[in-house]
A protein has these predicted regions:
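Beta-strand-rich domains and repeat architectures in extracellular enzymes and scaffolds
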Residues: 44-74, 276-277, 284-291
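Surface-exposed loop and turn segments in beta-propeller and other repeat-based domains
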Residues: 35-47, 87-98, 137-148, 185-207, ...
């Protein structure tokens, strides 16, 4: 009797492959070790009557800037060491040194640089000038940019006249590197839905919003998409964008709509929060993250994930209360978070990381 060993060998190889093949994680949280529980060390770090509606935090050195539109101004500056209130700045308007509402930016080297894609303006404020009580609100320079039909949701000033933008370029690319003369040095990384014909250029841009952070050298950046498990780690080398690592476990779920010149990208019942807020230091990228569905919870989380700049998971923290935004100090010693108390008042609390 002739016996064939080929089917048996094939089955054996299949079983061995099934045992050794790396299983794709269902959640970002599975990439990290057991979270470290943290308890708040300073529940009300800044004066409680100094905040209205917090929409973001950034920290660098001794400067803690809170996005908080109040009395016609966009931001409030606190001392990151003591919590002392210093001043409000970023007046809303169209005059010299004034900006549009909802302008986001990056804080580094004592400068807070914000942008508005509708007006194509980039505006810079000097933190030392603000601390010295300048009458002109710390405004130091402004310039316009022109990248054709490209649209930006976030912008970082890298220094030496270079800007890094995240958004949508040529209905295809997610990132752009350009200079103050509007010369485009590079574009990189295809957006997740570039081939999805249910999206046009406007709804595709709306479905690729997210958060962007950089390290102090301006050479490393990280960008995460809203309502997703997608985060990219990038480097800028000799005028080129290099994708260091891309962790794309679950794309956003959007319903694109357009009618009468009005465009929207709405979340679905299956959409989840994913990456909520990013912040960074020279060593790490911190990410506020939630696996919960949008319809089941608010846009907050008690889970903070920590990556190194190569995109490797390092550790995770579990806060004792849900946070809306986060910012780490440059020594990786403290984490500032925005919280809402039982009376729906905003406050900034601090967690010790060491």
């Amino acid at each position: 009797m002739k016996i064939s060993f080929i089917p048996f060998v094939s089955v054996l190889l299949a079983l061995l492959y099934g045992c050794t093949a790396e299983k794709k994680p269902e959640s970002v949280s599975e990439l990290f070790p057991v979270p470290i529980s943290l308890s708040c060390s300073a529940e009300s770090f800044v004066p409680e009557d100094s905040l209205a509606v917090v929409e973001g935090l950034v920290c660098s050195g001794r400067n803690l800037v809170v996005y908080d539109l109040q009395s016609g101004e966009s931001y409030v500056l606190f001392d990151a060491l003591s919590g002392e209130y210093i001043t409000r700045f970023g007046r809303i308007g169209q005059g010299p040194g004034e900006i549009s509402s909802g302008s986001y930016g990056c804080l580094s080297d004592g400068r807070f640089v914000v942008f508005d894609d509708a007006t194509k303006n980039v505006t810079a404020y000097d933190m030392d000038t603000l601390r010295n009580g300048a009458r002109h609100g710390g405004f130091v320079w402004r310039q316009r940019y022109d990248i054709g039909d490209g649209q930006l949701s976030r912008l970082a000033f890298l220094g030496n006249g270079l800007f890094f933008g995240a958004g949508l370029l040529d209905s295809h690319y997610q990132y752009i590197l350009f200079d103050s003369d509007n010369h485009i040095h590079d574009t990189a990384v295809e957006v997740y839905n570039s081939e999805d014909t249910s999206f046009d250029r406007y709804t595709r841009f709306l479905s690729n919003q997210g958060d962007l952070v950089m390290n102090c050298s301006g050479k490393r950046l990280a960008c995460a998409l809203n309502f997703s498990s997608n985060i990219d780690f990038l480097a800028v080398d000799e005028g080129k964008i290099r994708l260091v690592k891309s962790l794309r476990l679950k794309n956003p779920l959007y319903l694109p709509e357009s009618s009468g010149g009005i465009y929207s990208a709405s979340v679905t019942p299956e959409s989840f929060w994913g990456y909520i807020s990013l912040c960074s230091t020279d060593k790490y990228v911190y990410a506020l993250y939630s696996d919960k569905k949008v319809m089941e919870s608010g846009r907050c989380s008690s889970t903070v994930l920590v990556y190194d700049w190569d995109g490797n998971p390092v550790r995770s923290f579990q806060l004792d209360v849900p946070a809306f935004h986060i910012a780490a100090d440059e020594t990786d010693s403290h984490l500032f978070v925005s919280l809402m108390d039982e009376e729906h008042n905003w406050k900034i609390s601090v967690y010790d990381l060491k």
